[in-house]
Amino acid sequence: YCCHPACGPNFSC
């Protein structure tokens, strides 16, 4: 997953 603002549309926690 990608859990920081820079992930943009890929943001996931």
From Swiss-Prot:
Keyword Glycoprotein part of the UniProt annotation: no
Signal peptide per UniProt: none
Protein's UniProt keywords contain Disulfide bond: yes
GO MF annotation list: acetylcholine receptor inhibitor activity; toxin activity
Subcellular localization: Secreted
Residues bearing PTM Cysteine amide: 13
InterPro entries hit by this protein: Conotoxin_a-typ_CS
Alphabetic keyword roster: Acetylcholine receptor inhibiting toxin, Amidation, Disulfide bond, Neurotoxin, Postsynaptic neurotoxin, Secreted, Toxin
Cysteine disulfide links: 2-7, 3-13
Single GO cellular component term: host cell postsynaptic membrane
UniProt main location, coarse: secreted
Tissue and organ expression note: Expressed by the venom duct.
Remaining remarks: Five analogs with residue replacement and/or modifications (hydroxylation or bromination) have been synthesized. Four of them show decrease in both ability to inhibit acetylcholine receptors, and lethality towards fish. Negative results: does not show activity on human neuronal nACHR alpha-3-beta-2/CHRNA3-CHRNB2, alpha-4-beta-2/CHRNA4-CHRNB2, alpha-4-beta-4/CHRNA4-CHRNB4, alpha-7/CHRNA7, and alpha-9-alpha-10/CHRNA9-CHRNA10. Does not show activity on the synthetic AChR alpha-1-beta-1-gamma/CHRNA1-CHRNB1-CHRNG (IC(50)>10 uM).
Protein family per UniProt: Belongs to the conotoxin A superfamily.
Function: Alpha-conotoxins act on postsynaptic membranes, they bind to the nicotinic acetylcholine receptors (nAChR) and thus inhibit them. This toxin inhibits fetal and adult muscle-type nAChR (IC(50)=52.1 nM towards alpha-1-beta-1-gamma-delta/CHRNA1-CHRNB1-CHRNG-CHRND, and IC(50)=102.8 nM towards alpha-1-beta-1-delta-epsilon/CHRNA1-CHRNB1-CHRND-CHRNE). Shows potent activity on the synthetic AChR alpha-1-beta-1-delta/CHRNA1-CHRNB1-CHRND (IC(50)=16.9 nM).
Domain notes: The cysteine framework is I (CC-C-C). Alpha3/5 pattern.
Protein name per UniProt: Alpha-conotoxin OI
Species for this entry: Conus obscurus
Lineage start: Eukaryota, Metazoa, Spiralia, Lophotrochozoa, Mollusca
